[in-house]
């Protein structure tokens, strides 16, 4: 069991690192193109892809951190149930995150809401998912690269804060 747990942790961490590498690489490529002339359409298309990656990253990391939390705290059967019930979580706007977190501990949500950056976290998630859904359904999305980059940074900070809240 210990070997399997170590393997799962390594795989989860590998998924996190892979997402972050892909996102950071794409940010670097777009920054390079921003310094050139006449690449607006390419930057726009890459930004849409970046939006989708950030949404996927958000979903994977939320599940990862919840699984990590109850890894050593729950009975194996309960752990399996919890893991299966959250693994296909999508469209993680703040209301959905709050709803899921309340099922574990309402204090987590109360603490997060007191964070000075809470509204920025919420707005970033809203922007990412509104635009991801527009892109996925063929609608026009005017989200800019800088806005995406800022949202990504805020989402990373949100997860840092969430981990602290869950650990306290």
Model-identified regions with their sequence ranges:
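Flexible secondary-structure boundary motifs
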Residues: 71-142, 162-165
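A structural signal for well-ordered alpha-helices, especially hydrophobic packing surfaces
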Residues: 27-30, 34, 61, 132, ...
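C-terminal structured interaction module
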Residues: 143-168
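Short, solvent-exposed segments of well-ordered alpha helices
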Residues: 13, 17, 41-49, 119-126, ...
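Short, flexible helix-adjacent loops and helix caps
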Residues: 35-38, 66, 70, 137-140, ...
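Charged alpha-helical initiation segments
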Residues: 2-47
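Short, hydrophobic, well-ordered secondary-structure elements
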Residues: 44-67
